[in-house]
């Protein structure tokens, strides 16, 4: 790995050619520490512990150091149970407060839970900040293109025009005093799919810090990550305590504490060294490799891409990320990664950056210094291009070209 001297790099593609970047792109995914041990005996040399739970159609995991592992694990398990509660609150796939809001708000204001209200306000702020590239009301377009039920279809121009009439967060009416929301249009629908997972991660992290835990990492489905504090390292470890990842870096083994394995052991590890939590960005065509690593301390990362959620029609591939301003699936980007203070912001901005494309995403980050981006797209001469802004050279390590 080497530091980037500039904000733009091209990477040689080992394939003879990128037939179609939309055909070859891997699913946008952040690589976090992944358990690779095969036996409980190997856990004795662990320097990371984690708990895991399925929610929101993905796996959530919380990583932490072994010191006081038993106590931290109990808190982490409760934090992940909170994620499940939040899913029940925000889902639009079954009866929930959100489905009630969608059914009622065009007729009368609907009072909602205060934290969800604040989340919707944040979503509206990001809608305005991104000039509509992120829009919580774009679910109608997702349905129109068949992604809601994973049955892809291509709507005609007339249908897209009709769908766009029911899209737009400018049609939301917020009443801060009563914490109610109303819709100006009867066909408006809110869907928190682009920000809800990040919100759940933020809430779980908040729960952890309220219980005195300062150093941990949470991810949801490897597309949203929040790191708190530092990753504490052992001063010394046995030779077999690490293994090499696909890019040659040492990847510590971890110990799973929840969902299908074993009870934690006590640890006497000392905290003599630390480093930022490192997450990897997957190469779009070499799925076993990382194209870059980002070091995180008290920051979040979100990544968006269309590698798996797509369909073909008459030989053309359509991805699930739709520009809410045009009603058309986005093209021209492998993946978009956002770095932000919170996971909710990173989640939403990753989608917005994918819609914007590299140039406008970088322009956005230049105007909003609290955010950063990494944009991966097709380059020239069978290369993969990476643009980034708002992430220091100390935080971003880029894979070498060879």
Task: Say what each PLM segment does.
Residues 1-402:
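Mature catalytic core of soluble alpha/beta enzymes
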């Amino acid at each position: 790995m080497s530091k980037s001297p500039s904000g733009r790099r091209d990477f040689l593609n080992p394939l003879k050619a990128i037939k179609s970047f939309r055909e070859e792109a891997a699913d946008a995914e952040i690589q976090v520490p992944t358990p690779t041990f095969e036996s409980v005996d190997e856990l004795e040399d662990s320097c990371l512990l984690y708990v895991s739970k399925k929610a929101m159609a993905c796996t959530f995991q919380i990583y932490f150091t072994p010191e006081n592992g038993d106590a931290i694990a109990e808190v982490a398990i409760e934090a992940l149970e909170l994620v499940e509660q939040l899913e029940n609150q925000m889902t639009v796939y079954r009866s929930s407060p959100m489905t009630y809001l969608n059914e009622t708000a065009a007729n009368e204001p609907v009072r909602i839970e205060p934290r969800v209200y604040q989340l919707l306000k944040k979503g509206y702020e990001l809608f305005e900040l991104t000039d509509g590239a992120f829009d919580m009301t774009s679910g109608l377009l997702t349905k129109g293109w068949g992604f809601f039920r994973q049955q892809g279809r291509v709507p005609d121009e007339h249908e897209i025009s009709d769908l766009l009439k029911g899209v737009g967060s400018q049609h939301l009416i917020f009443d801060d005093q009563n914490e109610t929301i109303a819709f100006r249009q009867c066909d408006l629908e809110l869907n928190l799919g682009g920000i809800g997972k990040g919100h759940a991660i933020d809430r779980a992290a908040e729960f952890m810090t309220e219980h005195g835990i300062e150093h941990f990492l949470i991810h949801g489905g490897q597309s949203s990550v929040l790191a708190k504090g530092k990753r504490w390292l052992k001063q010394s470890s046995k030779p077999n305590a690490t293994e090499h990842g696909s890019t040659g870096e040492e990847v510590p083994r971890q110990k799973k504490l929840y969902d299908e394995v074993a009870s934690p052991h006590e640890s006497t590890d000392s905290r003599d060294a630390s480093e930022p939590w490192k997450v990897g960005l997957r190469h779009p065509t070499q799925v076993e490799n990382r194209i870059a690593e980002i070091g995180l301390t008290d920051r979040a990362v979100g990544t968006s891409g269309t590698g798996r959620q797509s369909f073909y029609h008459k030989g053309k591939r359509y991805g699930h990320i739709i520009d809410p301003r045009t009603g058309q699936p986005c093209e021209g980007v492998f993946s978009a990664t956002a770095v932000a203070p919170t996971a909710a912001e990173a989640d939403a901005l990753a989608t917005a950056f994918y819609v914007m494309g590299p140039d406008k995403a970088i322009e956005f980050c230049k105007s909003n210094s609290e955010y950063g981006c990494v944009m991966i797209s097709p380059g020239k001469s069978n290369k993969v291009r990476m643009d980034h802004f708002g992430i220091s050279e100390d935080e971003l390590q880029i894979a070498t070209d060879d």
